[in-house]
Amino acid sequence: MKKNNIPLFPLGLVSLPGTMQSLQIFEPRYINMVKSCMQNNSGFVITLSTQKNNETNYGISKNGTYVEIIDFNNLPNGLLGITVKSIHKVKINNITELDDGLHMADAEALIDPEVDDQAILAEHPDLINILMQLVKHPKMNDKYLKVDFNSADSVSYHLAGLIPLTSNEKQSLLEAFDANQRMKILSSYIKKL
């Protein structure tokens, strides 16, 4: 699946497929983007913003996540709050910039090869246990947390979204070839925590 001319939202965070993100929108270009997405029942791509030489010069990662808005509200601080669901990872091509500074691009869905979920999950019972403990934690807001414990993709993406990893570490998990590679990388990160 390829979508042409889709809005990009470069952020200092990585949104992982199957997970939810709450965002506060304040820049006019992104408020307009949200309005347009709501009117057209379409989504946008969250991509990692990469810092370059100085604060005003940044790059956009070529891999991101297509998201759809599932909730919005006006926050007490006057900002627009939105909750997005991350649908799938994408490869970004042909980036252009509109007059208002909003970036648009072509986005092609990246589908991981099928794996033997049960075999992968059996290799990583420690990761499943950590995720189960986190999901059961009383401070966990599980309003949008829907983990499929029979899916290596779901387990790896949700666990990565809940533990303290850097944006670059999360980006490496997003860019992993498949769930097997992602679980191995995640396991190595957890050993360092």
Model-derived features with residue positions:
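Positively charged
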Residues: 1-145, 154, 168, 172, ...
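Core structural elements
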Residues: 148-165
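Amphipathic alpha-helical segments within well-ordered protein domains
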Residues: 160, 171-174
